[in-house]
Amino acid sequence: MSKPNKFRRIGSLAEFYHAASIPWVATFTLNKRYLHPDYNLTWWKRLRLVFRLWRNTRRIETGTSYKAQAAIAAKLFEIPRAVPGVVVECGCWKGGSTTNLSIISKIAGRSLIVYDSFEGLPDAEEGDRHAKPEAKGLYSGSLETVTSNV
């Protein structure tokens, strides 16, 4: 019996664009001049990290792009290792961002704490500028799904 393929073939021009932009994201979003020297992130290490972020967002559904996650990594890597703190994710849906944040947190030497009600988005309330009533329950997930994906 053949082993299941964990990777999807690039099937659209948009997917090709995202794959082709990996070196650019590694170079410009994770710009070495802004990263703290504690992390010793060479261009090859940054390229590998961005590739892993991209691969995981293709493997596990996530509400954010790998580019947004690379931007989060860039902000985190500006902070010296000696500064105490943890990384917190509020809402993990299926665990795609959690998977990538765990990689980023490990490189940064920080713990990742994840919170989720697994009920999805709440009801829209008066005063919510961008919330839509039909979004209630969107992004609901389960602990089993997250733990199997992370």
Segments (PLM) and residue ranges:
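S-adenosylmethionine/decaboxylated-SAM
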Residues: 46, 52-59, 77, 81-150
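Class I SAM-dependent methyltransferase Rossmann-like catalytic core
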Residues: 7-86
